Amino acid sequence: MQKEVIKANIVVFIASFCTLVIELVAGRIMAPHVGVSLYTWTSIIGVVLAGISIGAYVGGLLADRFPRPSTLGWLLFASGIGALSISPLTNLLGAAHFQTTLMVRILILTTFIFFIPSCILGMISPVVVKLTLHNLAKTGNVVGKLYAFSTLGSIIGTFATGFFLISWMGTRNLLLTVGIILIISALVFGGLVTRRKPSAIFLVISTVIILSLTWVFHGYAFKMPVDDKTYFFEESDYYTLQIRKCLTRDQQTWADALVLDHLIHSINVYDDPFHLDYEYIRIYEELMRWRMNRSGTLATLFIGGGGYTLPRALELMYPKAEIDVVEIDPEITRLAHEYLGVPKNTRIRSFNEDGRWFVMNSADEGKYDFIVGDAFNDLSIPYHLTTKEFALQMARLLKPDGILMANVIDSYQKGLFMPSYIRTLEEVFGKGNVHLVSPKPDKENTGISTRVIVASRRGVDMNDFVKFIGEKDGKGVMSHVMPQERLQQYLTERPSVILTDDYVPVDNLTAPIFEERYGYRTH
């Protein structure tokens, strides 16, 4: 009896451990196809929980109908096959085009890929309970231990995967390992055979199946979701990272694009640091050039490094500039040096930590002429970097006339995040001291695009800025400033909220972007 209980505890531990590994891996393996957002994790958690729930119900029926050890063995074997199927299915379905919105597409993908493995793993515990309970007088003790070991497996699976396994093994190697562990568990604990000859036959067949599946797995499942222009692919602790060759906006120059999850974040021309392909980065540069001309100093803090496109250009433009970059992912910083043209002996100071943590703990009060927020994208906005409290912390590090700049991807007509973020900054910097700068003069009729929000407690003389860049650049001007009166009218017309640490519904505010950018697709 004691031996059976120990065996049962090990089995439920393994099943729960593997379930949580699959759940955490799901977010990473889906990222190149649908990004990482609240909607992605909502679908993953919901589908996995639904699978476990239905699996527990079906497992109870199976346990009563087939109360023998081989039932457990076949479930462990099937769950191993299910784990091995995740990567091939992701490659197959992730590339498919669905005539539906992105949110529904995410739900469809997660259901097809993760429901069956979760459901089979959910069947295991009821079968284990049925096979273990022989003495009703000790039911509470036995069931309590089973639940304890099951929960322990979930806990260790969570921490081991998040803190260690993904960064050490990568998602596809990890899924391969999970599949093999479950299949081996079927052989060790499953009771699939009781006599020596059938055992030998089964082991031979199982070995052939495992080797065949491993070959198929490596042949197709390890095929990364990349094209022939992608020459670097890696999963870091924070992103799925890709670097690919692409043409610049003028379609004349080859550049290197840094892709974080699904989104091209930076485009760098390796031997031309002054090439700024993105319009919003050119707006940043125009504002800094104007400020440098007027004050002669340029101390800049970047929240989000990405490809270090503007920092490396500023280093050459202004040899006396102080440039600090806070980039949470040290692997991105390494790639910037190795592939994206940032020299090893750079004057740029990099800090690999969370942007808010850095700002909150910085002793450099009143140091910076500019703080540049470049950590937002359309599908995944770090909500803790959008709040009034964080804006107050950034304002502390700015000089009295220092300027905060942040790029925001939103729809002018339908967007809810942009007006909310502007109103939030007005709470800190004052009404009339926050400005909206667009790369196109017809800013009100453009759809989803990247705009720059500019804020300063002493105000920014945008008329002088516009005059300066007009004189210097003429037709090459990129920055188009919305008149303050029109901006205030816009804020009145659009629904918005003040974003605080207590209430920051960023994913709900960006939902219109999903509908407009990833609505019904036709191909």
Predicted feature locations:
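Alpha-helical transmembrane segments of multi-pass membrane proteins
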Residues: 1-233, 245-254, 262-265, 289-298, ...
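Glycine-rich SAM-binding Motif I of class I
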Residues: 304-312
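Short alpha-helix immediately C-terminal to the canonical SAM-binding loop
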Residues: 333-334
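Class I SAM-dependent methyltransferase Rossmann-like catalytic core
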Residues: 267-291
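Short, solvent-exposed loop/turn elements at domain surfaces
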Residues: 250-254, 265-269, 462-464, 498-499
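Class I SAM-dependent methyltransferase core
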Residues: 302-305, 327
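Glycine/threonine-rich flexible loop motifs
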Residues: 379-386
